[in-house]
Amino acid sequence: MKKLMGLIAIVMLLLSACGSQEGFETVTIDGIQKKVEEGYSVLDVREPSEFEAGHIRAASNKPLSDLQQDNFEGLDTDGKYIVICQSGNRSKQASDLLSEEYYNVVNVSEGMSSWTGEIE
C-alpha cells in the first residue's frame, strides 16, 4: 500500500509539473530590444485608448479582448511577437492564447508601466 501511495504521489507530481509549463519564453522589459533585433515585432495587447495614450515605437495594437474572442485578424502565423501590456498580466494571458494557436511569442513580464524608453 505504501508503494502504491508513493507511486501515486510521484505521478501526481509529474503531472502537475507538466501542466505548469508555458509554451513561450518570458523576458523582462530590458529584453525587448534584443528580441526586436532578432526579428520580433512588438504586439501591445492593451485596449486602443491605452495604446493611443502612449506605446513603444513601431508596436502594433491587438487588444486581449479581441484575442479572447478568437480574433487573430492581422497577425501573421509565421510572425514572431513580443507581447506587452500595462503591467504583465494581460500580456501573459495573450501569450497563453497565442501560443495555443501556434504563434511564436515572447511575453514581457513587466509592462508599459516599467518602460523608460521613447513612446509614441
Protein language model features and the residues they cover:
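Rhodanese-like catalytic fold shared by cysteine-dependent sulfurtransferases
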Residues: L4-G6, C18-I29, K35-Y40, S49-K80, ...
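C-terminal motif of bacterial Sec signal peptides marking the signal peptidase cleavage site
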Residues: L13-A17
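Structural scaffold elements adjacent to functional motifs in cytosolic proteins
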Residues: V42-D44
